[in-house]
Amino acid sequence: MGQKVNPTGLRVGIIRDWEAKWYAEKDFAAYLKEDLQIRKFIEKRLVDASVSTVEIERAANRVNISIHTAKPGMVIGKGGSEVENLRKELNDLTGKRVHINIVEIKKPDLDAKLVGENIARQLEGRVAFRRAMRGTMQRTMRSGAKGIKTQVAGRLNGADMSRVESYAEGTVPLHTLRADIDYAWVEAHTTYGSLGVKTWIYRGEILPEKKQSNGQGGK
């Protein structure tokens, strides 16, 4: 089962947290639609800013958005001008008070979304898929990953028939729930059509903290 299921969804509540931190009964559909609009808007607006994840929290008429990016300077802008413009645009989009928090990604080579985007951009630039995948995987392993697996599907190198090619280095234990595995799917748009790029990165194990018992010895 671990081979088929989304590794992030499988680990939510165990070693991963939700990217949307709110609860609603009557307004659930409206909030979910708004979340999708926010994520789509940020993805288009900050397409060159290496944005990995967007976390959304809600409280009354306020929306707190945490943007995880490898290029915080590009998102913030000179004197905070860019992030202020983004906040105003999101205010108009949602009709709510929006607060934006920028979180820097210290090691972009260990982030599955950014690694996948890197491979996708190379494929769009007509780099051979094997070269793009292997070069990126070696850089990720040098950055401290325990293992990485990449998969590209579509009309590779402009072939008439679409196929799937995958490569792996190190270990990627998909069944181990305490294994910190980052997963992402990215699309590359080439002259021959769209290619799907999947990335799994194993960053080590996250062990649950042992609870200390305050009980005294004896019966």
Curated annotation (Swiss-Prot):
Domain KH type-2: 38-106
Gene Ontology MF terms in the entry: mRNA binding; rRNA binding; structural constituent of ribosome
Key words of the record: Ribonucleoprotein, Ribosomal protein, RNA-binding, rRNA-binding
Gene Ontology cellular component annotations, sorted alphabetically: cytosolic small ribosomal subunit
One Gene Ontology biological process: translation
Pfam families: KH_2, Ribosomal_S3_C
Subunit structure as annotated in this protein's UniProt entry: Part of the 30S ribosomal subunit. Forms a tight complex with proteins S10 and S14.
Functional summary from the UniProt entry: Binds the lower part of the 30S subunit head. Binds mRNA in the 70S ribosome, positioning it for translation.
PANTHER family in the cross-refs: 30S/40S RIBOSOMAL PROTEIN S3, SMALL RIBOSOMAL SUBUNIT PROTEIN US3C
Family: Belongs to the universal ribosomal protein uS3 family.
Descriptive protein name: Small ribosomal subunit protein uS3
Lineage start: Bacteria, Bacillati, Bacillota, Bacilli, Lactobacillales
